[in-house]
Amino acid sequence: MKLLLIRHGATPGNLEKRYVGRTDESLTQESLEKLRKEAERIRELSGIPLAVVTSPMKRCLETAEALFPEHIYREVPRFQVEGLSECDFGKFEYKNYLELSGNAEYQHFIDTMGAEGFPDGE
């Protein structure tokens, strides 16, 4: 048995280098198109999946659908697991390093290499 782990495609926030955790945004159109083009190669690598397991986030569901479309893989069970959702970035959610520049809490986070987690997050 093979286990294939795939990160979701790009969202607008990812392209802007934002901390995208609990913000539930869709993939960009360009990312969806790229995933659809890669789908055949990925399916050749993995074969018919025994199951498709994702987080309930839009970006993950859209990635799974682009790679393993339900109309082709009707018989494959799909599971959404809340525990696979991205972490909570707290006060840093949907901000990028430029927006956080000069923020004392952000600098502390960087200086401690995140050892204490995100303020008001995980």
Language-model regions: role of each:
Residues 71-122:
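Phosphate-handling substructures
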Residues 1-10, 102-108:
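Short coil-to-beta-strand
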Residues 3, 7-73:
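Active-site-proximal alpha-helix that buttresses catalytic centers in soluble enzyme cores
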